[in-house]
A protein has these predicted regions:
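Class I S-adenosyl-L-methionine-dependent methyltransferase catalytic core
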Residues: 1-142
Length: 142
């Protein structure tokens, strides 16, 4: 997805994968695509460590796309970490890929401050895969 985003005009993509062989494959693909070094970064880390790092740095993203291992049912946890870490820009989108039976639209968000609350705005199913898209609650209300 990151390479597709770059090909469609994204100025920068941050890849996160804890599997070193996947990280290596991403770097190799970037070289093959002749990407500018400042257009992407590859972080080899567990998603929780990476998101915590971004939060401490005050980094926010316009789009966060996550494709966690389905069997681990991490979608809800990721939404909560993105909310509490304030990792989305005001008009940003969080897109979570997950199993259709993982109900991410039912995540409890009432306890989060209004300016960091994420709400589901769309859900799509593609065969055995679902995508749930979240946005900042204040943006949705405008």
């Amino acid at each position: 997805m990151g390479f597709e985003a770059l090909s469609r005009g994204a100025s920068h993509v941050t890849f996160v994968d804890k599997d070193r062989s996947c990280a290596s494959a991403i770097k190799q693909s970037a070289r093959q695509f002749k990407l500018e070094a400042d257009s992407y970064e590859m972080i080899s880390a567990d998603f929780e460590k990476a998101l915590s790092f971004f939060s401490r740095q005050g980094t926010s993203f316009d789009i966060i796309f996550v494709d966690p291992p389905y069997k681990m049912h991490l979608g809800g946890k990721i939404v909560q970490i993105v909310q509490t870490g304030r990792l989305l820009s005001n008009r940003g989108l969080l897109i979570v890929e997950h199993l259709p039976n993982e109900l991410l639209d039912k995540i409890e968000v009432e306890s989060y401050p209004q300016d960091s609350k994420l709400v589901p705005i769309d859900q799509r199913r593609y065969g055995s895969t679902s995508l749930t898209i979240f946005a900042n609650a204040l943006t949705v209300e405008e």
